Amino acid sequence: MLNANVNVSRDVENPYKELGNAIILQAGKDYIHYRKRFHKHHKDFDYFRMKECENFFHSDWAQLLTDIDPFVIIEKIKKECKKNGY
């Protein structure tokens, strides 16, 4: 499961940053979920949802939520998926 290895740190002093981190983390978990399903079933729906997550990481909104480079986020998620066999 995706964890804070993407350097999404907790910031209890800034609840808005905490919320932004939670949104980014959930998008990563969603990507993993759909990639796992796509690996198993090869359904277009799962592929398009994966791409939707990738597009989110490159969106202006995601860039407002985190300072982490979207390519770094996606690369770390893909490495974790490969490590787990999907």
Language-model features: where?
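N-terminal acidic leader/helix
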Residues: 2-42
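Short, charge-rich amphipathic interface segments used for partner binding and complex assembly
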Residues: 44-82
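Short intrinsically disordered terminal tails
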Residues: 1, 80-86
